Amino acid sequence: MPFTKSCRSANTLRKGIKNGKLILKIIVNDIDNVESCLSGDESNDSKKSSASFYMKLKYGSYRALADNILSTDENRKEDIAVFDVPLPNGLQIDTFTLCLYRKSKWKKQIVGEAYIGIQALLLSTNPDETCKYPVISPPSGRNKENQSPSHQICNLSLKWIIYDPEDADADSKTLAKAWLQQIKMNQTSIDPMSNISKSLKELEVDNVESDLEDSSFIAEPDSSIPPSESSVSISTDTGKETPPSKSKKSSNQPYVSIGEGNSDLLGFVFLEIISVSNLPPLKNVFRTGFDMDPFVITAFSKNIFRTKWLRHNLNPVYNEKFLFEVGAFESNYDLVFKVVDHDKMSLNDSIAVGSFNVQSIINSSAQVDPETGLYSFNIETSSPSQDTSSKAEDSPTVQKIADDFSSAVGKDLRTDIIEQIIPLTLCCKHDFSTPRDVKLSFKAMFFPIAALRQKFWRVMLAQYGDIEDGHIGKLGMYAVLDTLGSNIPNSMVDDIYTELSSKNHDDTSDSITVDEAVICLERLVDLVCHQDQQATQTPQSPSSNEESGPGTPTQTSDQYEDSEDSRNFPSKLYLVYLSNCPLCLKFKLSKVNQQKATVHLATCASHDWKRVDRLMMTSYVSLNQAQRRWFSKAFAKVVYGSSKVGSTSATTLVQNRQTGQIQEEKMNAYVRIGIRLLYRGIRNRRIEGSKVKKILRSLTLKQGMKYDSPISVKEIKPFIRFFDLNMNEVDMPVGGFKTFNEFFYRKLKPGSRPCAFPDNPDILVSPADSRIVAYECIEKATTYWIKGTEFTVERLLGYSNEAQRFVGGSICISRLAPQDYHRFHSPVNGCIGPITKIEGQYYTVNPMAIRSYLDVFGENVRVLIPIDSNEFGKVMLVAVGAMMVGSTVLTVDEGKIVQRSDELGYFKFGGSTVITLFEPNVTSFDEDLLRNSKTKIETLVKMGERIGQKIDPNKPTDAEDHSKSDS
């Protein structure tokens, strides 16, 4: 019997039903001329009989599969395949493909494809009416010159039905007419050929004239289904649909990755590494002289840069320039510099390391005028020295705008250049009679994103605005907006002009100054950005206007409700309505909101490619990876897996919250490989077997007994050296521990982990030194992080009566690595409730296991500690044991009143996890934790640090000041 796989197709179908979309049911009745399909390459009858056929439906990114659809049995059922396809609200792809495959024991191959147009199908046939479509064979042959042409091999018969999941009694024909009418209205609501196409056809960039003249820069109407990789053309002479032709990828085009996804962008830092002085003369292999071929690795947050290496030099001079972005939550991060010695044969050696806080660079940047909101520029951008006629003949090019802009930013913006010489700490083994004073010299500037955007407006006004005597008229502003593809009505611009001219002028002139024109464009930016924010927070009908308080940007649009032309207003306002960025030709402006679109245009135009050597090294994700040789990276790729941020591999990446650096979690190589083979291997299903469970339990208990023995004291010093632990925080000297376990759950000195905001009980603090992922609701945690197929809140809490209180609530997962301080504390003020211990297994809590099909949290041994808090309600803290964790010891009793950061217990040797559950709508986590969690990367925090706060319904939450408050 045919079936549809419950994978991506089922998820897409479920999502479509949830969003209230209509469902198109495609029923394939028959495929005639089956014998021709069966007469493939194999001539052996046994091979023919062993082959099976399946059919796949492709529609955009939607996929559905029906298996075992063809059979030589005469008693097979009439309907051989049934597919349910959610119809989009806006039609961007009109054709879906039915692919017929043949699968044998050793291989599978495509038999043919049928291309069905949705609108043509619904218009030409009635529901439950059978129609036939040809199945076209794909071209055979690897080389294009030797390929045989496609030909028809058989026909398939199908019929269709449209149904509404919310209205079972609705008629299919009525629903089809309503959907076609809606598609027609959506296609005509926004004119794709706006004035921007005329402007773009006049632009000329070297080697890309044909790409710019294409109308593909005009954004298509919004659609809930992503664009397909292929397109279907219809022959005009035969009226039949032809197979899609694969579009060629554009090559050798510059790609700008700056400013793509970070809408909360503070600005950019322009960094120039000048030189390094007084490096140590390390001996070469033959001890005949020194060997030093240094290069510098610079890291900021998730950006890694690397200079060239200079041969045999103790005072290298680089003069290499870099540019990186600074987000709103990265203003207190450190710039980390690492000097590395390049070796031809062996591994590269670390020489020295240092850091510099980026806040010092930000403080020296240009300051905004508090009254006007504008940044000061030394030279105002003037209009070109040519008349109107010559301007019409010689239209300014995109390259000229970019050159003028990038040069003007460096000259005009009043930003101080910081020149710093910082000391570096040697991290190599050396034996010198006199200490080496290694120093690094660099220059840095910070450009606020708002200043770049305002400078971009000035350049656009100068090129397109027709500035006369320092003033710009309404027609000039209309031209600028048309160039950007904006659909903002002229009446809205007229009212802003009237308001600005009445404030600063006595007459009622139709022109304003350039500064006022920049203010006008900034208001429009606030308008469209506020519109996007409201759309994401409260869904509403397109025609309804959003309520806004006094002084909000939407106040500009509300005053047009009663105007005469309000009926002509578009349902959504666009300041930038382009498909691709006309500068880098790569970034899809139509796929992002208006704030990100304006940020990208301003930053893309501001970059002077001649002054910047590199923008972003996407191949590096950490300092250690940038230091490795090619063969080390190749070995790690094969053995450990991908090292990208968010990937499920043996290389665990975490972001240090204090410095912002991406760090590789230190772990023995055999442990990495063992966990990867055990939980991510080919036969990882055997991990659920009783034998494996017994082995893990036995090893855990034996390891706990071993480290409780006095002989285990000898393991303490190698453990400290391997993980480079800071023993100055420990309350007891190393010689005072009698066993390794005593050292493992060591206490720290008082004051080593201060509680954030000690007088504010509404602040949520971290329960342990750990790597944290936090989600606003548990459903998001199962989407991004917890991949256990059987994970539920009820199973995690042992099916207790309290489980229903936390369904739909918030969750914080704090993972403790072996090198962490292994005592856990209370994150809130409250009273300890009845404690429950649940026996279970001893699986590892490494992210590789958590993000597998195995329900680690629901299977492992754990302790439930409820806390009744006046601020956060019922809070459930779950202490989860793990592989090699001997036991979980509690130091608190039931009924005890605890304050934030009070100790609750500790784990013996091994990794472990503390899960904190909150009731719905009680807690809001800090934004940096939520962002990292959505990108599947853990954040390294210390016990007592702020991680969130109580939701106050009377005032908005403020999760953006945690970094300043913690520092």
From Swiss-Prot:
Cofactor: how bound: Binds 1 pyruvoyl group covalently per subunit.
Domain notes: The C2 domains have an essential, but non-catalytic function. They may facilitate interactions with other proteins and are required for lipid transport function.
Gene that encodes the chain: psd3
Annotated localization: Golgi apparatus membrane; Endosome membrane; Cytoplasm
Main location: Golgi
C2 domain boundaries: 250-373
Record-level GO cellular component terms: cell division site; cytosol; endosome membrane; fungal-type vacuole membrane; Golgi membrane; Golgi stack
Keywords on record: Calcium, Cytoplasm, Decarboxylase, Endosome, Golgi apparatus, Lipid biosynthesis, Lipid metabolism, Lyase, Membrane, Metal-binding, Phospholipid biosynthesis, Phospholipid metabolism, Pyruvate, Zymogen
Entry-linked CDD domains: C2_PSD
Molecular functions (GO terms): metal ion binding; phosphatidylserine decarboxylase activity; phospholipid binding
SUPFAM superfamilies (UniProt xref): C2 domain (Calcium/lipid-binding domain, CaLB)
Oligomeric and partner information: Heterodimer of a large membrane-associated beta subunit and a small pyruvoyl-containing alpha subunit.
Site (described: Cleavage (non-hydrolytic)): 911-912
GO biological process, one term: phosphatidylethanolamine biosynthetic process
Modification type Pyruvic acid (Ser): residues: 912
Protein name in UniProt: Phosphatidylserine decarboxylase proenzyme 3
Its membrane topology: Peripheral membrane protein
Region (Disordered): 217-255, 532-566, 947-967
Active site: 769, 825, 912
Biased composition (Polar residues): 545-558
Known EC number: 4.1.1.65
Low complexity composition bias: residue spans: 220-237, 532-544
Lineage: Eukaryota, Fungi, Dikarya, Ascomycota, Taphrinomycotina
UniProt record similarity statement: Belongs to the phosphatidylserine decarboxylase family. PSD-B subfamily. Eukaryotic type II sub-subfamily.
Role summary: Catalyzes the formation of phosphatidylethanolamine (PtdEtn) from phosphatidylserine (PtdSer). Plays a central role in phospholipid metabolism and in the interorganelle trafficking of phosphatidylserine. Together with psd1 and psd2, responsible for the majority of phosphatidylethanolamine synthesis.
Family matches, as InterPro entries: C2_dom (IPR000008), C2_domain_sf (IPR035892), PS_Dcarbxylase (IPR003817), PSD-B (IPR033177), PSD_type2_pro (IPR033179)
PANTHER family, sorted: PHOSPHATIDYLSERINE DECARBOXYLASE (PTHR10067), PHOSPHATIDYLSERINE DECARBOXYLASE PROENZYME 2 (PTHR10067:SF17)
